[in-house]
Design a protein with these regions (language model features):
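Hydrophobic, lipid-facing positions within transmembrane beta-strands of outer-membrane proteins
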Residues: 31-33, 62-68, 116-120, 134, ...
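Short glycine/proline- and aromatic-enriched beta-strand/turn motifs that initiate or cap beta-hairpins
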Residues: 17-65, 225-227
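A generic local structural motif
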Residues: 19-22, 123, 172
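Extracellular/periplasm-exposed beta-strand and loop segments of Gram-negative cell-envelope proteins
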Residues: 42-61, 89-115, 143-167, 197-221
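Predominantly the C-terminal beta-signal and adjacent terminal strand-loop region
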Residues: 172, 176-227
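Gram-negative (and chloroplast) outer-membrane scaffold detector with strong preference
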Residues: 27-31, 39-45, 71-149, 223-227
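Sec-dependent N-terminal signal peptides
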Residues: 4-13
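Short, flexible, glycine/charge-rich loop motifs used to bind or transfer phosphoryl groups or to couple energy/partner
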Residues: 22-24, 125-127, 210-211
Length: 227
Protein backbone atom coordinates (compact mmCIF):
# COMPACT_ATOMS: atom_id res chain seq x y z
CA UNK A 1 0.00 0.00 0.00
CA UNK A 2 2.73 2.49 0.98
CA UNK A 3 4.73 1.78 -2.18
CA UNK A 4 1.65 2.46 -4.33
CA UNK A 5 1.04 5.76 -2.56
CA UNK A 6 4.66 6.84 -3.06
CA UNK A 7 4.51 5.86 -6.73
CA UNK A 8 1.32 7.89 -7.16
CA UNK A 9 2.93 10.92 -5.51
CA UNK A 10 5.96 10.66 -7.80
CA UNK A 11 3.64 10.72 -10.81
CA UNK A 12 1.90 13.83 -9.44
CA UNK A 13 5.27 15.48 -8.85
CA UNK A 14 6.29 14.80 -12.42
CA UNK A 15 3.01 16.08 -13.84
CA UNK A 16 3.06 19.27 -11.76
CA UNK A 17 6.70 20.05 -12.63
CA UNK A 18 6.60 22.69 -15.33
CA UNK A 19 8.27 25.90 -16.41
CA UNK A 20 4.80 27.47 -16.24
CA UNK A 21 2.72 27.96 -13.13
CA UNK A 22 -0.67 26.28 -13.08
CA UNK A 23 -3.65 27.92 -11.35
CA UNK A 24 -1.73 31.15 -10.79
CA UNK A 25 -4.65 32.95 -9.15
CA UNK A 26 -5.90 30.04 -7.06
CA UNK A 27 -4.43 31.29 -3.78
CA UNK A 28 -5.97 34.74 -4.24
CA UNK A 29 -9.39 33.36 -3.34
CA UNK A 30 -10.57 34.16 0.18
CA UNK A 31 -12.66 31.00 0.38
CA UNK A 32 -12.18 27.67 -1.32
CA UNK A 33 -13.88 24.29 -1.07
CA UNK A 34 -12.85 20.73 -1.71
CA UNK A 35 -13.20 17.14 -0.61
CA UNK A 36 -10.92 14.37 0.58
CA UNK A 37 -10.67 10.61 0.56
CA UNK A 38 -8.11 8.60 2.46
CA UNK A 39 -7.18 5.76 4.75
CA UNK A 40 -6.87 5.61 8.52
CA UNK A 41 -5.38 3.35 11.13
CA UNK A 42 -6.61 3.64 14.73
CA UNK A 43 -4.66 2.48 17.76
CA UNK A 44 -5.05 2.87 21.53
CA UNK A 45 -2.74 3.97 24.29
CA UNK A 46 -3.61 2.30 27.60
CA UNK A 47 -2.41 3.77 30.91
CA UNK A 48 -2.71 1.32 33.79
CA UNK A 49 -3.34 1.91 37.47
CA UNK A 50 -0.80 -0.79 38.33
CA UNK A 51 1.92 -2.46 36.31
CA UNK A 52 0.72 -5.57 34.54
CA UNK A 53 2.57 -8.42 32.79
CA UNK A 54 -0.47 -8.84 30.52
CA UNK A 55 -1.03 -5.52 28.72
CA UNK A 56 -3.99 -5.04 26.43
CA UNK A 57 -3.04 -5.22 22.75
CA UNK A 58 -4.76 -3.84 19.67
CA UNK A 59 -4.86 -5.60 16.31
CA UNK A 60 -5.13 -2.71 13.86
CA UNK A 61 -6.60 -2.55 10.36
CA UNK A 62 -6.93 0.18 7.75
CA UNK A 63 -10.18 2.10 7.45
CA UNK A 64 -11.58 4.73 5.10
CA UNK A 65 -11.96 8.52 5.40
CA UNK A 66 -14.24 10.68 3.24
CA UNK A 67 -15.20 14.28 3.83
CA UNK A 68 -15.53 17.89 2.74
CA UNK A 69 -13.16 20.85 3.13
CA UNK A 70 -13.88 24.53 3.64
CA UNK A 71 -10.81 26.75 3.75
CA UNK A 72 -10.70 30.45 4.70
CA UNK A 73 -7.70 32.59 3.77
CA UNK A 74 -6.40 34.67 6.72
CA UNK A 75 -3.30 36.03 4.99
CA UNK A 76 -0.92 34.86 2.26
CA UNK A 77 0.45 32.05 4.43
CA UNK A 78 -2.27 31.23 6.97
CA UNK A 79 -5.58 29.49 6.34
CA UNK A 80 -8.36 28.22 8.60
CA UNK A 81 -9.66 24.82 7.55
CA UNK A 82 -12.88 23.02 8.55
CA UNK A 83 -12.90 19.38 7.42
CA UNK A 84 -16.00 17.39 8.50
CA UNK A 85 -16.04 13.79 7.39
CA UNK A 86 -17.06 10.19 7.98
CA UNK A 87 -14.38 7.76 9.16
CA UNK A 88 -15.00 4.00 9.19
CA UNK A 89 -12.68 1.59 10.96
CA UNK A 90 -12.45 -1.83 12.58
CA UNK A 91 -10.00 -3.12 15.19
CA UNK A 92 -9.61 -6.00 17.63
CA UNK A 93 -8.92 -5.32 21.29
CA UNK A 94 -7.27 -8.29 22.97
CA UNK A 95 -7.30 -8.78 26.74
CA UNK A 96 -4.24 -10.87 27.61
CA UNK A 97 -4.97 -11.55 31.31
CA UNK A 98 -5.36 -15.32 30.94
CA UNK A 99 -5.88 -15.94 34.65
CA UNK A 100 -9.16 -14.07 34.59
CA UNK A 101 -10.63 -15.57 31.43
CA UNK A 102 -11.15 -19.21 30.52
CA UNK A 103 -12.78 -18.70 27.13
CA UNK A 104 -10.97 -17.15 24.17
CA UNK A 105 -14.16 -15.29 23.31
CA UNK A 106 -13.85 -13.41 26.60
CA UNK A 107 -10.46 -12.01 25.60
CA UNK A 108 -11.26 -10.73 22.12
CA UNK A 109 -13.42 -7.71 21.44
CA UNK A 110 -14.10 -6.72 17.82
CA UNK A 111 -14.78 -2.98 17.63
CA UNK A 112 -16.42 -1.48 14.55
CA UNK A 113 -16.78 2.28 14.49
CA UNK A 114 -18.24 4.90 12.18
CA UNK A 115 -17.26 8.37 13.32
CA UNK A 116 -18.42 11.82 12.30
CA UNK A 117 -15.06 13.57 12.61
CA UNK A 118 -14.94 17.40 12.70
CA UNK A 119 -11.49 19.07 12.78
CA UNK A 120 -10.83 22.81 12.87
CA UNK A 121 -7.23 23.35 11.81
CA UNK A 122 -4.82 26.21 11.24
CA UNK A 123 -2.81 25.73 8.06
CA UNK A 124 0.57 27.35 7.47
CA UNK A 125 1.71 27.23 3.85
CA UNK A 126 5.30 27.91 2.81
CA UNK A 127 6.14 30.02 -0.21
CA UNK A 128 5.01 28.47 -3.47
CA UNK A 129 7.79 26.97 -5.59
CA UNK A 130 6.66 26.50 -9.18
CA UNK A 131 3.68 24.14 -8.78
CA UNK A 132 4.50 22.89 -5.27
CA UNK A 133 3.68 24.34 -1.88
CA UNK A 134 4.38 22.41 1.37
CA UNK A 135 2.31 23.10 4.44
CA UNK A 136 1.75 22.23 8.09
CA UNK A 137 -1.59 21.90 9.86
CA UNK A 138 -2.43 21.82 13.56
CA UNK A 139 -5.62 22.14 15.55
CA UNK A 140 -8.38 20.48 17.51
CA UNK A 141 -11.16 18.12 16.54
CA UNK A 142 -14.14 16.27 17.91
CA UNK A 143 -15.80 13.02 16.86
CA UNK A 144 -19.20 11.44 17.35
CA UNK A 145 -19.37 7.66 17.18
CA UNK A 146 -22.50 6.54 15.37
CA UNK A 147 -22.15 2.99 16.68
CA UNK A 148 -23.23 1.93 20.15
CA UNK A 149 -19.82 0.94 21.50
CA UNK A 150 -20.32 -1.40 24.43
CA UNK A 151 -18.00 -3.93 26.01
CA UNK A 152 -20.16 -6.90 25.20
CA UNK A 153 -17.79 -9.83 25.39
CA UNK A 154 -19.07 -13.38 24.98
CA UNK A 155 -21.81 -13.51 27.64
CA UNK A 156 -19.59 -12.32 30.46
CA UNK A 157 -22.51 -11.82 32.83
CA UNK A 158 -21.09 -8.59 34.22
CA UNK A 159 -22.37 -5.10 33.73
CA UNK A 160 -21.25 -3.95 30.29
CA UNK A 161 -18.76 -1.14 30.05
CA UNK A 162 -19.17 1.56 27.44
CA UNK A 163 -16.83 3.69 25.39
CA UNK A 164 -17.50 7.40 25.29
CA UNK A 165 -19.68 8.43 22.35
CA UNK A 166 -17.96 11.84 22.03
CA UNK A 167 -14.22 12.34 21.88
CA UNK A 168 -11.80 15.26 21.53
CA UNK A 169 -8.38 15.31 19.85
CA UNK A 170 -5.44 17.42 18.83
CA UNK A 171 -4.04 16.92 15.34
CA UNK A 172 -0.75 17.55 13.53
CA UNK A 173 -0.30 17.18 9.79
CA UNK A 174 2.20 17.67 7.00
CA UNK A 175 1.35 17.85 3.32
CA UNK A 176 2.13 19.29 -0.09
CA UNK A 177 -0.14 21.21 -2.47
CA UNK A 178 0.36 20.21 -6.10
CA UNK A 179 -1.03 22.78 -8.54
CA UNK A 180 -2.16 20.75 -11.52
CA UNK A 181 -3.65 22.11 -14.70
CA UNK A 182 -7.31 22.07 -13.67
CA UNK A 183 -7.32 21.53 -9.89
CA UNK A 184 -5.14 21.45 -6.80
CA UNK A 185 -4.21 18.05 -5.37
CA UNK A 186 -3.07 17.89 -1.75
CA UNK A 187 -1.83 14.65 -0.11
CA UNK A 188 -1.09 14.75 3.62
CA UNK A 189 -0.09 12.60 6.58
CA UNK A 190 -1.77 13.36 9.91
CA UNK A 191 -1.36 12.24 13.49
CA UNK A 192 -4.45 12.33 15.72
CA UNK A 193 -4.27 12.07 19.53
CA UNK A 194 -7.24 11.94 21.89
CA UNK A 195 -7.50 14.20 24.93
CA UNK A 196 -10.28 12.29 26.67
CA UNK A 197 -10.38 9.03 28.58
CA UNK A 198 -12.72 6.73 26.66
CA UNK A 199 -13.56 4.42 29.58
CA UNK A 200 -14.05 6.86 32.49
CA UNK A 201 -16.30 4.75 34.76
CA UNK A 202 -14.37 1.64 35.69
CA UNK A 203 -15.65 -0.62 38.45
CA UNK A 204 -13.31 -2.70 40.66
CA UNK A 205 -15.24 -5.92 39.99
CA UNK A 206 -14.87 -5.70 36.21
CA UNK A 207 -11.84 -7.81 35.16
CA UNK A 208 -11.68 -6.19 31.73
CA UNK A 209 -11.28 -2.58 32.81
CA UNK A 210 -10.53 -2.41 36.53
CA UNK A 211 -6.79 -1.89 36.01
CA UNK A 212 -7.26 0.75 33.29
CA UNK A 213 -6.60 4.32 34.37
CA UNK A 214 -6.94 5.89 30.91
CA UNK A 215 -7.84 4.51 27.51
CA UNK A 216 -6.81 6.94 24.76
CA UNK A 217 -7.10 6.82 20.98
CA UNK A 218 -4.28 7.51 18.56
CA UNK A 219 -4.56 7.41 14.78
CA UNK A 220 -2.73 8.05 11.54
CA UNK A 221 -4.59 9.47 8.53
CA UNK A 222 -3.32 9.57 4.96
CA UNK A 223 -5.66 11.90 3.08
CA UNK A 224 -5.86 12.92 -0.56
CA UNK A 225 -7.59 16.28 -0.98
CA UNK A 226 -8.92 17.86 -4.16
CA UNK A 227 -9.82 21.55 -4.59
Amino acid sequence: MLSRILFFLLICSHISYSQFKNLQNFDERDLRFGYYIGINQYDNKVIYKNNTPYPISVDRAEGINVGLIGELKLNKNLFLSLEPGLHANKKNIIFNERKEFTNYGDTLWVVKSNNIHIPLLLKYSAKRLDNFRPYLKAGLSTSINLNEIEGTLSNNGLENFKFEKFNFYYELAFGVDFYLRYFKFSPSVRGVFSLKNEIPNNTPDNPWTRNIDKFLTRAIFINFSFY
